[in-house]
């Protein structure tokens, strides 16, 4: 067993996020594990850029309301205690509603060292029109 000291909170880079986003690395995976886990906090209206993960991603909402959008125009609302999974290669974005902070636990796997592909591929920023699309509550 090993106790891991917390790292300093990081600010989300502008290339990857619109608005103010802060994250704490909870787990960065040590071989053979490739598990990654971050606690991510979004200011009202903040969101990721479009991106996808080679091995998929799971988002567990802790506080606020999360918005998760996909290329087909779907924007899901997820509330505290709810979990959303994004399959490998699915282009998506996630963020907070315009009027509240949102916090989620983001879980994903890194790629194998000999795989040659990035674990996350970052794309263009989400437009206001995409962000403001009608939302769906899925139960």
Can you name each region flagged by the protein language model?
Residues 1-34, 119-139:
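A short, N-terminal "cap"/entry segment at the start of jelly-roll beta-barrel domains
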């Amino acid at each position: 067993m090993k106790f891991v000291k917390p790292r300093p909170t990081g600010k989300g880079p502008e290339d990857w996020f619109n608005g103010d986003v802060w994250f704490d690395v909870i787990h960065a995976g040590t071989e053979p594990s490739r598990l990654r886990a971050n606690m991510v906090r979004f200011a009202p209206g903040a969101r990721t850029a479009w991106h996808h993960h080679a091995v998929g991603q799971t988002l567990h909402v802790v506080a606020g309301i999360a918005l998760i959008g996909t290329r087909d125009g779907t924007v899901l609302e997820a509330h505290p205690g709810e979990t959303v999974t994004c399959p490998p290669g699915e282009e998506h974005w996630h963020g907070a509603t315009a009027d509240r902070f949102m916090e989620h636990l983001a879980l994903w796997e890194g790629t194998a060292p000999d795989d040659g592909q990035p674990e996350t591929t970052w794309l263009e920023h989400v437009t206001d029109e995409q962000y403001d699309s009608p939302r769906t509550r899925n139960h």
